[in-house]
């Protein structure tokens, strides 16, 4: 739907690219167009039976953004471990794009949707505090009109800090595929290594059990998000035995 970078500067484009983007925008600003397109995509995915919608902010890395028109991303040797998630949201470079994401959340909420926000790549406690403050600055203070903000466990540090991070957030979403990659330092897109990424390995199960235990202690929700569950009987057993756990499968 969108071919250009969310922080695009039209003056930096070639005449050909500028003409392409201008045609796409139809008189709107780049940010206005992004909001309208992404709102349409999100609203089309929301079904009448969805009482509550968890919406995750962008977890895209610089490698993916670098494929877009008007990008001005700094080249990173390892984008997956680079500027993404909270470190991107709080940066001056990404402020226009973060504003777009916040506008979308506010528009959805003002339209009557019960939106609960999920923050990806919360690496540290300071990340947690920073993003809550940043959301408040954008008119999305946690707790106002029952607005809930969750954080995503994408790497082991967020699991190790889960009890403290829960002071800042209303719940946890465990991105199991991402957590597995960062736990074992395996790129699942690498054909030579992908077979070694076992999501029911004992190390990962220990991390999952910690998140479940800590959320139960404070009576806050835990959602496990993963691409597929069928190949993992150990995880199936763990999830069945776990109190109050919810599972989201994207297969």
Language-model regions, residue ranges each:
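Non-catalytic helical/linker scaffolds that mediate oligomerization, partner binding
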Residues: 1-251
